[in-house]
Amino acid sequence: MKRTIYLYLILLFNFFNLTAQQQKSIDHTLQLLNNNSVPYISVQELNEELLKGEVLIFDTRKKEEYQVSRIKNAKFIGEQLNTDSLSLDVLDKDQPIVVYCSIGVRSEDLGEVLLKKGFTNVKNLYGGIFLWKNKGFEVFDQLDRPTENIHAYNRFWGRLLKSGNKIY
């Protein structure tokens, strides 16, 4: 009987622990994993910049994530600064650039690389494409059509995506 109660308490503890883990926000995750080496831009600010048409936006996720959906006009640059389809040498070093990934962790790494290469106006999208979609902004598929599909990276990170269809 004591063993059954003990097992029940362990299961109950694990359930509440898992629930608490799932409730951790993007804010908390970024505080834990980022070092703020690249200035942030909010999803609202990025939307305004995109309407003006004066910003380059780089998707720093894996190719399969980019193929599911992306922010309008985002260029694929990948996690390892894939410049096959983009030459950084021809870009103005003062050109406004925004990097993003799922929530803003991988994009901070690529933002640091761009800053080290001499780019002076690089920002990291706070909350990445997940917060972008959670706030109701559109994402687009490979054919530049609006889509509800978002590559959620994996089930652990996908818990931070509250809007759209999660694709794994």
What name fits each language-model region?
Residues 59-60, 100, 125:
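Active-site-adjacent beta-strand anchor residues
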Residues 2, 18-40, 67-95, 108-168:
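Rhodanese-like catalytic fold shared by cysteine-dependent sulfurtransferases
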Residues 6-17:
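Bacterial N-terminal signal peptides
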Residues 46, 54-61, 74:
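Short hydrophobic beta-strand that contains or immediately precedes a catalytic carboxylate
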Residues 102-106:
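Gly/Ser/Thr-rich loops at beta-strand to alpha-helix junctions
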Residues 56, 96-98:
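Structural motif
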Residues 51-53, 93-94:
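Residue-level preference for short coil/turn positions at secondary-structure junctions
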